[in-house]
Amino acid sequence: VAQAVILAFSALLIIPSALQARVQGGNKKPSLSLKATPAVSFAPARVVVVAEVRGGADDNEEFYCPTVEWEWGDFTTSTAEADCEPYEAGKSQIRRRYTVEHQFKNPGSFRIRLMLKKGTKVISSANALVQVRPGLGPPGGDQQ
């Protein structure tokens, strides 16, 4: 009887990886972080922005196949929609990383905002600040 109890207890300690992910916070809502590089530059500035979805289950239905909307802070926006297969619990995988490049032609402070949306509902958003300083002018141009 003691051996049966020990074996049953040992079997409980061996948790399949998918179940283990859920036990370790996989049911928590993922969070979104945003980083712009470089954070400070000269106009015209080419900035690379990386967004990461952290935490939560890899098959989180709410974060599966969202519309991705970027507000650049310079009165322009970008939107992307993926053509995804229908969601299947335990099979569908959320995208964990979004990378995009944007050019700021004029100097200023810009608040970049990324929104992940399902229809019109924002499911998560994140912000990053970029500072673009006046450029030195055209190469070989007169500096007055």
PLM feature spans:
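Bacterial N-terminal signal peptides
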Residues: 4-16
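Extracellular/lumenal mature domains of secreted and surface-exposed proteins
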Residues: 17-144
